[in-house]
Amino acid sequence: MPKTVAYLGPEGTYTDEACYFYAPDEERIPFSSLGLVTSALEEGKVDEAVVPIENSLGGTVIEVVDYLITSEKAHIKGEILLPIDHCLVTRPGVQLSDITVVKSKQEALTQCREFLSTELRFAEQIPTTSTASAVTDLKESDDRTAAIGPRRSAELANLPILIQGIQDRQNNVTRFAVLSSNGDTPDNSDKTSIAFDFDRPDGPGLVFGALSPFADRDINLLKIESRPTGKGMGNYIFILDFEGHIDQPHVKEAIAELTKHTATFKVFGSYPRAQGLAGR
């Protein structure tokens, strides 16, 4: 019996593309918001969920991180690195000179600002709820309208791609997390994601003292960032990614040293590190 995997829909979004790459033969279920995706996982309505957690240009997806901090069920069991390759999609036979309206999600319009300002500088830009819906709506539009969206959305809608790769930055990558209620056994390519805050607001050497146990054990830190806890100015929670699995002895030792100074500590998951970009 195939497992059920929730994702942020509709079909044809970049999250759908990541979910399809991860689970092509499983039952993929779209939801209209990240909140509904995480609720479905939390309530046991699905086995897993694929959610965006970080973008190389836009940074961390705060809603997902906040969910992981508070959830007692969800764990990261895998990750997918998906190149964000924006395509200009049209109705059949449409040329660039015909286009007077461009529709897409606001983030996509912003990420294609240079192309739009040079190639379609007189075209009206209309934001939509998703890149996929912008492409799907072309079926009911006239030949003056184009959409910016993923290749997959164009393929699903059976519409031609006029120009591919119109984003300003070619290194635009979104990291997706695969969430589950179950963890995985150690692998040689594991990474671990954790969150913690300190038992006091600040102090000399506080962050250094928290991170030095990792350096002392040659544990490579992959990412560190902070965000407000909501408990008042100067109170932050730290998000840390590092190489290794939470069950490895040297990682356990580093965590034991770290938690001597923390008020809150949460393991998001230990999981295989993505090996390259999806589909490349």
Task: Report the location of each language-model feature.
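Domain-level signature for soluble enzymes in the chorismate/prephenate branch of the shikimate pathway
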Residues: M1-R280
